[in-house]
Each structure stands twice: as structure tokens, then as C-alpha cells.
Amino acid sequence: MSGALDVLQMKEEDVLKFLAAGTHLGGTNLDFQMEQYIYKRKSDGIYIINLKRTWEKLLLAARAIVAIENPADVSVISSRNTGQRAVLKFAAATGATPIAGRFTPGTFTNQIQAAFREPRLLVVTDPRADHQPLTEASYVNLPTIALCNTDSPLRYVDIAIPCNNKGAHSVGLMWWMLAREVLRMRGTISREHPWEVMPDLYFYRDPEEIEKEEQAAAEKAVTKEEFQGEWTAPAPEFTATQPEVADWSEGVQVPSVPIQQFPTEDWSAQPTTEDWSAAPTAQATEWVGTTTEWS
């Protein structure tokens, strides 16, 4: 499909990207029309997709997209969450019309509908999940391109790109590869230099994971501020003025503080004491009488 041109051959870095994203890993089920794209079957039952055929079909799909004069006439669709961000990024890079989320039935066939469109080419992420736009495309003679897994039905699909269309990294990488090839064939970017856009921008991210990362970053920032505050706290300033001594041989004059005077008493005067020889009180006599009775 590449015409034996070295420029269009798959590079080693592209193969490494495919392997890292798991693009070559299919499912455990196999559609009879997808047998031509299978390289081998693993011992655990997972089919391995031939990446050479994937690259050839990717170039064919890019040529079909470039053949459309108006980029807005290309509709890219993804009803699954894993491909919605990739579809929007692809549309922003190539000028296509994205439909991310639920596809409204009748968009291609019902002319009185507000969202009615007449595209010239349709690209879907999953033929099984996006069966409604594929069915309507068959009614209006609309050519279609689809990212197909080993168990994907190929009905109403004109150009099938064999890949793993279930994983978020694989789907994002395929849309990134397709956008890069489209821009290269249009002459927007050069093949000699790498594309400055990273594939990570096309990957789907779970909102819960994003929220957890933001919370972790906020906690880390707060901890860092507290740690720095302990070490960078300003030292207390001593505002007490020190006495200036010109001649160190002279003593420092200490300011005199008046001493409060208290009245003095005559300690020689003895207080009057009671007569210890006096008879005990009546209460003591009563106690003595009580003890006498007990005896």
C-alpha cells in the first residue's frame, strides 16, 4: 500500500508507540472478515493484529481524508468516552466536523432536523458502538472509515483500520497517527521533523483520576508552603536600645529605681499570750466525765 517508498514506510519509533499503547492486542473473539488482519493467536486466546496491515490501512484512510477538498465535510464520530477527546483533537488539527457523544438519529437522513448534515466522508471509532451513523451512511451513499477490532462487524465499513479500539491509549494513538498522516500528506508538516503535538493530548482521562491528581497536587503545595514557612520565619527583632559606651574603662551608669518604703514594726514588743495554766473549758470537762462513765 505504501508503494515501496521509504518515506511512507513505518518507522521504528512508530512501532514502539504501537506496542506501548497495546494497539496490536485484539480480543478473544474473531470476526471472519477480520481474519486477514490477524498475525497470530496467543496462548491465552488473545489475537495479535498485524501492525503492517494496520499501517497500510492507516495510510489509505489518510489519503481518503486528504482527497476531500473541504475539511469540514469530513465527520468524525465517537460515542464512547475513550475516543471523544481524540475526536475533538483530530477535528481541531485537521478541520473536520466532530460529533462527540450521543449521535442523534436522523442527522444524515432527516432534512427537517436542526442538526442535519451532509458530509462527504465519515470516520467512526467503533463500528459496534457507532452502528447508527454507519447505518444512516449506507442510506445516503456515504463512504466510511472505522477503527476495527478483531470482533468488529465490517458491515457498511469501506476502509477498516485494524487496531485495538477498546483501550484509551490505543484509540488516542490511532487518532493521533491519522491526524499526523493527514497533515503530512497535505504538506502542513514535514516528514523530516517530528510533530510537536504529543500523543498524550489525545488520550482519554477519567475525571475521577484528574480530581485525585489535583487534590494530591494541592496537598503537596500546602505541605511545601508550611515546610518553607518554618525555615523562613523572620527572626524576632530586638527593639531594646543598648547603652552606648564611649570609654570601656568607665562603668555603665545603671538608672536608679526608687525603692518603695514599707512601715516597720517593733519586733521587741511581744504579743500578749494567754494563761496556759487556766482551767480547761467546760467542753473538756464534759468529755472527761464521759470517759469516767465508760471506765
UniProtKB/Swiss-Prot annotation:
UniProt xrefs under InterPro entries: Ribosomal_uS2, Ribosomal_uS2_C, Ribosomal_uS2_CS, Ribosomal_uS2_euk, Ribosomal_uS2_euk/arc, Ribosomal_uS2_flav_dom_sf, Ribosomal_uS2_vert
Pfam families linked to this entry: 40S_SA_C, Ribosomal_S2
PTM summary: Acylated. Acylation may be a prerequisite for conversion of the monomeric 37 kDa laminin receptor precursor (37LRP) to the mature dimeric 67 kDa laminin receptor (67LR), and may provide a mechanism for membrane association. Cleaved by stromelysin-3 (ST3) at the cell surface. Cleavage by stromelysin-3 may be a mechanism to alter cell-extracellular matrix interactions.
Subcellular localization(s) per the UniProt record: Cell membrane; Cytoplasm; Nucleus
GO cellular component, as recorded: cytoplasmic side of rough endoplasmic reticulum membrane; cytosolic small ribosomal subunit; nucleus; plasma membrane
Modified residues (Phosphothreonine): T97
Region (Laminin-binding): 161-180, 205-229, 242-295
Residue numbers marked as site, Cleavage: A115, F116, P133, L134
Region (Disordered): 266-295
Taxonomic superkingdom: Eukaryota
Biological processes per GO annotation: cytoplasmic translation; ribosomal small subunit assembly
Sequence positions bearing N-acetylserine: S2
Keyword Membrane recorded: yes
Family: Belongs to the universal ribosomal protein uS2 family.
Further information: This protein appears to have acquired a second function as a laminin receptor specifically in the vertebrate lineage. It is thought that in vertebrates 37/67 kDa laminin receptor acquired a dual function during evolution. It developed from the ribosomal protein SA, playing an essential role in the protein biosynthesis lacking any laminin binding activity, to a cell surface receptor with laminin binding activity.
Protein's recorded name: Small ribosomal subunit protein uS2
Native species: Sus scrofa
Gene for this chain: RPSA
